[in-house]
Curated annotation (Swiss-Prot):
It holds the Pfam family AIRS. The keyword Magnesium does not apply. This is Phosphoribosylformylglycinamidine cyclo-ligase. Pathway: Purine metabolism; IMP biosynthesis via de novo pathway; 5-amino-1-(5-phospho-D-ribosyl)imidazole from N(2)-formyl-N(1)-(5-phospho-D-ribosyl)glycinamide: step 2/2. One of its GO terms (biological process) is adenine biosynthetic process. One of its GO terms (cellular component) is cytosol. Its EC number is 6.3.3.1. HAMAP family: AIRS.
Length: 345
C-alpha cells in the first residue's frame, strides 16, 4: 500500500539543501589551502593533483586516521572547531616521519542529521590543519545517515597523500648505536588514549571545568594535536635525520620500535623532560601505573627524532627557531638478544 502523500529524501532524513549550504560555507577554508599542483575546483567527481616538478623520482606516501573518542568529549562540550586540526595532524604527522611532504587531504564526515553550523566548524578546522601543514584540502564526503548515529553525534576520518624523493626516504635503516634522540613537545594528549581519559573522568567524578595550571581541565584535554610538518621538513633539509617516531596509540613502547633496526634499542632518560600537568593529573586521578602511562599517552612528547650525536646542537637550535620546544632525551644503543627495544630510565 502506497503512502497518501508524496515522500522526499528530506522526509527520510537527508537534507540535500543543508549539504549544499555546507559546501558553500567551506569554500574559503578550502581555497586557503590550495597548492599550485591542484587542478580543478571543489565539487568534481574526483580531485586532480599534479606531482611537484622538483622531484626526480617521486614516491607517494599515503595515510589514513581518525580522532578516536576525543570526538566524544568535543561533542559533549560543543568544541567543534579544533577536532579538524586533530584529524589532519594524525595523518600528516604519520607522513612526515618518512620524510614525505603532504600534498593533499580528503575528509569523511558522517552524521545522523547534518547540522550545518557544527559541520562548518569541523571542516574549517580541517582547513586550518591543512594550512598549517602546507597540504591542500581537495575533497571529501559528507554522509548524512539517519538511523546510524544518535542525536548530534558525528564521526570523522581523514586521508592524506604526500611525496618524498626516493633517495631521501626516511625508514630507520640508517639508525645506529650512538645516535642521539631528540623529543619534540606535544600540545597535550593529542588524539590518543581518550577512552582512558574518559574513564578517569568517570571514575574520579572530576569536574572537567576545574582549574589545572591556569585553565580548565577540559581545555587541556581538547587542545588540538600539534602539527610538526613544516619544522621537521626544515630539519630534514638541514640535518641528517635517521628516523622519526610519531608517538600515538601505543605510546613509547609501541611506536619507537617501529623505526628501529632489530639490533638497536632506544635508551631514554625519563627525567630529561617534565610531563605537562594534564598527564600528571591523569596518572594521579586514574591511579595509572607509569608503564601504562607510557603505553597509552605521549606524556608530553609528540615526536622523537634520531640523528647523529654531533648534529644535536644545530638541530635543537633550528627547532627552537621554528617555535618547537625540544630536548635531548636519550640515545640509541646496541641491542643484545631479546632485549626490549625501548628502555626508560
Amino acid at each position: 500500500m502506497s503512502t497518501p502523500t508524496p515522500l522526499s529524501y528530506k522526509d527520510a532524513g537527508v537534507d540535500i539543501d543543508a549539504g549544499n549550504a555546507l559546501v558553500n560555507n567551506i569554500k574559503a577554508a578550502v581555497k586557503r589551502t590550495r597548492r599550485p599542483e591542484v587542478m580543478g575546483n571543489l565539487g568534481g567527481f574526483g580531485a586532480l593533483c599534479e606531482l611537484p616538478t622538483k622531484y626526480k623520482q617521486p614516491v607517494l606516501v599515503s595515510g589514513t586516521d581518525g580522532v578516536g573518542t576525543k570526538l566524544r568529549l568535543a561533542i559533549d562540550y560543543k568544541k567543534h572547531d579544533t577536532v579538524g586540526i586533530d584529524l589532519v595532524a594524525m595523518c600528516v604527522n604519520d607522513l612526515i616521519v618518512q620524510g614525505a611532504e603532504p600534498l593533499f587531504f580528503l575528509d569523511y564526515y558522517a552524521t545522523g542529521k547534518l547540522d550545518v553550523e557544527t559541520a562548518t566548524a569541523v571542516v574549517n578546522g580541517i582547513g586550518e590543519g591543512c594550512f598549517q601543514s602546507g597540504c591542500a584540502l581537495i575533497g571529501g564526503e559528507t554522509a548524512e545517515m539517519p538511523g546510524m548515529y544518535e542525536g548530534e553525534d558525528y564521526d570523522l576520518a581523514g586521508f592524506c597523500v604526500g611525496v618524498v624523493e626516493k633517495a631521501d626516504i626516511i625508514d630507520g635503516s640508517k639508525v645506529a648505536a650512538g645516535d642521539a634522540l631528540i623529543a619534540l613537545a606535544s600540545s597535550g594528549p593529542h588524539s590518543n588514549g581518550y577512552s582512558l581519559v574518559r574513564k578517569v573522568l568517570e571514575v574520579s567524578q572530576a569536574d572537567p571545568q576545574q582549574d589545572l595550571n591556569g585553565k580548565p581541565l577540559i581545555q587541556h584535554l581538547l587542545e588540538p594535536t600539534k602539527i610538526y610538518v613544516k619544522s621537521l621538513l626544515k630539519l630534514i633539509e638541514a640535518s641528517d635525520v635517521h628516523a622519526m617516531a610519531h608517538i600515538t596509540g601505543g605510546g613509547f613502547w609501541e611506536n619507537i620500535p617501529r623505526v628501529l633496526p632489530e639490533n638497536c634499542k632506544a635508551v631514554i632518560q625519563g627525567d630529561s623532560w617534565q610531563w605537562p600537568a594534564v598527564f600528571s593529573w591523569l596518572m594521579e586521578n586514574g591511579n595509572i601505573a607509569e608503564y601504562e602511562m607510557y603505553r597509552t599517552f605521549n606524556c608530553g612528547v609528540g615526536m622523537i627524532v634520531a640523528l647523529p650525536a654531533d648534529k644535536v646542537d644545530a638541530a635543537l637550535a633550528l627547532l627552537a627557531a621554528e617555535g618547537e620546544q625540544a630536548w635531548l632525551i636519550g640515545a640509541i644503543a646496541a641491542r643484545e638478544g631479546n632485549e626490549e627495544q625501548v628502555e626508560i630510565l
